[in-house]
Curated annotation (Swiss-Prot):
Membrane topology term: Single-pass membrane protein
Chain coiled-coil ranges: none
Location of the protein in the cell: Mitochondrion membrane
One Gene Ontology biological process: proton motive force-driven ATP synthesis
Organism: Gallus gallus (Chicken)
UniProt name for this protein: ATP synthase F(0) complex subunit 8
GO molecular function term, any single one: proton transmembrane transporter activity
UniProt function note: Subunit 8, of the mitochondrial membrane ATP synthase complex (F(1)F(0) ATP synthase or Complex V) that produces ATP from ADP in the presence of a proton gradient across the membrane which is generated by electron transport complexes of the respiratory chain. ATP synthase complex consist of a soluble F(1) head domain - the catalytic core - and a membrane F(1) domain - the membrane proton channel. These two domains are linked by a central stalk rotating inside the F(1) region and a stationary peripheral stalk.
One Pfam family this sequence matches: ATP-synt_8
The gene coding this protein: MT-ATP8
Subcellular location, principal: mitochondrion
Binding partners and assembly: Component of the ATP synthase complex composed at least of ATP5F1A/subunit alpha, ATP5F1B/subunit beta, ATP5MC1/subunit c (homooctomer), MT-ATP6/subunit a, MT-ATP8/subunit 8, ATP5ME/subunit e, ATP5MF/subunit f, ATP5MG/subunit g, ATP5MK/subunit k, ATP5MJ/subunit j, ATP5F1C/subunit gamma, ATP5F1D/subunit delta, ATP5F1E/subunit epsilon, ATP5PF/subunit F6, ATP5PB/subunit b, ATP5PD/subunit d, ATP5PO/subunit OSCP.
Assigned GO CC terms: mitochondrial membrane; proton-transporting ATP synthase complex
Amino acid sequence: MPQLNPNPWFSIMLLTWFTFSLLIQPKLLSFTLTNNPANKITTTKPTPWTWPWT
């Protein structure tokens, strides 16, 4: 059964992951973010609805 033979597919998978992790990933991580992430801790309490019949 050829689909169970891992010889070509395993090497292709390893080559793909090494290419991604060594060449593409550092180039993607070198970009600067346009908006700096900020902590959003502000919590607002909802205003209760005033029912006209109570």
